[in-house]
């Protein structure tokens, strides 16, 4: 097994001795402006406070630096990004398959599943499959899709409704209505 040097990932902000400017625009711990000071003076102030000097805006003239606890800053940043990820809802397309001869009991079970999908904010794809001689009775399939559409009109809006059969199936896509 080979040993190797562990490559340190580059930090997004330069801190303490990594800052290269001679003068910096300094911001205090509480966000108050301390004016333009020399880098040495800024580093002395951070030593006194026992925290880090972090370069916030390296492209400014002079660069903007802030006195802060860098570890705490990174923790807060990662915590807020995790919160934002939690709030994002990924919309999925859930599929339910019907047949032209789907009985009433099965229809109700599938309808309940569709209602659950739409209430959770997901799109629903209703696939109606035809087998054998069922192809001759496409109007029965259209009746099933129209019934589903009518039963879910309070919860969903139709995104796509089949005008003709594609292969051996008809596909209808429903999207949840926006909540007011």
UniProtKB/Swiss-Prot annotation:
GO biological process terms on file: ribosome disassembly
InterPro entries: T_IF-3_C_sf, T_IF-3_N_sf, Translation_initiation_fac3_CS, Translation_initiation_fac_3, Translation_initiation_fac_3_C, Translation_initiation_fac_3_N
GO molecular function per UniProt: ribosome binding; translation initiation factor activity
Family matches, as Pfam families: IF3_C (PF00707), IF3_N (PF05198)
Keywords: Cytoplasm, Initiation factor, Protein biosynthesis
Record flagged with keyword Electron transport: no
Lineage top rank: taxon: Bacteria
Gene Ontology terms: cellular component: cytosol; membrane
Alphabetical list of Gene3D superfamilies matching this protein: Translation initiation factor 3 (IF-3), C-terminal domain, Translation initiation factor 3 (IF-3), N-terminal domain
Cellular compartment(s): Cytoplasm
Classification via SUPFAM superfamilies: Translation initiation factor IF3, C-terminal domain, Translation initiation factor IF3, N-terminal domain
Subunit annotation: Monomer.
Alphabetical list of HAMAP family matching this protein: IF_3 (MF_00080)
Family, per entry: Belongs to the IF-3 family.
NCBIfam families the record matches: infC
Biological function: IF-3 binds to the 30S ribosomal subunit and shifts the equilibrium between 70S ribosomes and their 50S and 30S subunits in favor of the free subunits, thus enhancing the availability of 30S subunits on which protein synthesis initiation begins.
Protein's recorded name: Translation initiation factor IF-3
Organism, as annotated: Salmonella paratyphi A (strain ATCC 9150 / SARB42)
């Amino acid at each position: 097994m080979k040993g190797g040097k562990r490559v340190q990932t580059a930090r997004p902000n330069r801190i303490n001795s990594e800052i290269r400017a001679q003068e910096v625009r300094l911001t205090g711990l509480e966000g108050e402006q301390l004016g333009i000071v020399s880098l040495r003076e800024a580093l002395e102030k951070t030593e006194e406070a026992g925290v880090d000097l972090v370069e916030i805006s390296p492209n400014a003239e002079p660069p903007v630096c802030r006195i802060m606890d860098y570890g705490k800053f990174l923790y807060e940043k990662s915590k807020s990004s995790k919160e934002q990820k939690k709030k994002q809802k990924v919309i999925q397309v859930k599929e339910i398959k019907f047949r032209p001869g789907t009985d009433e009991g099965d229809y109700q079970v599938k309808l309940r599943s569709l209602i659950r999908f739409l209430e959770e904010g997901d799109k629903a794809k209703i696939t109606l499959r035809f087998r054998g001689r069922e192809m001759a009775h496409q109007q029965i399939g259209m009746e099933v899709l129209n019934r589903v559409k009518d039963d879910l009109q309070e919860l969903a809006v139709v995104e796509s409704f089949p005008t003709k059969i594609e292969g051996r199936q008809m596909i209808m896509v429903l999207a949840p209505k926006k909540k007011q």
